[in-house]
């Protein structure tokens, strides 16, 4: 967000997405992408502390059925995830960044989330977008707002192959603290 990357008062990526961003903008994009990844991991590992860590305490979310403080959502959603799904995977991609200043950014990201139901016989697949707002305070970026936009969702029957054939010997994932990523990333 240096002056050379601004066109008519807007950040360069708003009006010319091919313009190479400056170092400050690249650093901001990296921090924001890291937050998006940590948000997905927190949902998939049923980690309320990790989810709260990506939001400022005053942040709000709009998840359709829940509209309110993000930290309250973090406490509520973990029970819902653990009570309905054996495993989830939230994949975020195609993020578009819109910097309104050096300390404020709005993003649109595509989300593709798979949810293996507790019975192991079906999965719910969600495709949508996250409309997020981020702020940098004292050199730290965090989310201030998230709205989930649903493009489509479907439920599919699955055949669980985790214990069969060449998959039998693989380490199995979990949404609990027994997942190997907890010790791997410690």
Please provide the spans of the model-predicted regions.
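A solvent-exposed, acidic/Ser-Thr-rich amphipathic alpha-helical stretch
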Residues: 48-116
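Short, conserved clusters of charged catalytic residues that mark active-site
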Residues: 34, 92, 129
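Acidic/histidine-enriched, glycine/proline-rich intrinsically disordered or flexible terminal extensions
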Residues: 156-186
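Short beta-strand edge/turn micro-motifs at domain boundaries
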Residues: 2-10, 106, 127-161
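Short, low-complexity N-terminal intrinsically disordered segments enriched in polar/charged residues
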Residues: 2-41, 45, 49, 53
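Outer-membrane beta-barrel transmembrane domain signature
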Residues: 123-125
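Flexible, membrane-facing loop/turn or short amphipathic-helix motifs
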Residues: 117-121
